[in-house]
Amino acid sequence: TLIRAVENAHPVISGGVAVTGWKKGCDDPRITKELRSKIWVAKAPSFGNRIVETRQMWVDGNKAQRAAQFPDGVMERMIDFNPEEQTITIPASQIGNLPNARQLEMIVHQRWAIAILRVKSIDVRGEQAVIRFHEPESHLEFAHPWPQPVIGGEKGNSSFCLTNALELLDQPGEWFQEYPSGTIYYYPRSEED
């Protein structure tokens, strides 16, 4: 099948659905008091009696960033990658108020690939935090031989970023979807209303 645009047209093929019913303001204590009045909240759309669960959100044609520890593209270096224990150790200073974040994920850069791992637990031990992950991704991450994260490499250890927690919603253009309710939180950019 070949799809072509008519002359001077700019078609968009999308499986996206509009999120409507936005309300400004949020009283969730996981968001800092200073930001609560800036956050917009909406219920996710439903299809076939199921709430739409999404990993991407677009606002006015621009991809919004899932709530993250750092701005898009910024990452921190891990301390250890332990296949026997199936853990990754990171600086405890990167944990902040996240030990109880229910939907927290870790993005791990490992050579030419990335892994997105759902965090199961965080054990803070002094200046280090040992992180365990849910299955099946824990087994997949630690059992496959290549590419695993680099520890002690010429250019340093592999990098990571923590994402997908309401506690991380702190920058304009970030969003978060709460499960199982499906509630979507969005911190608009300055040019958005």
Language model features with spans:
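Extracellular polysaccharide-degrading/modifying enzymes targeting complex plant/algal/animal polysaccharides
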Residues: 1-193
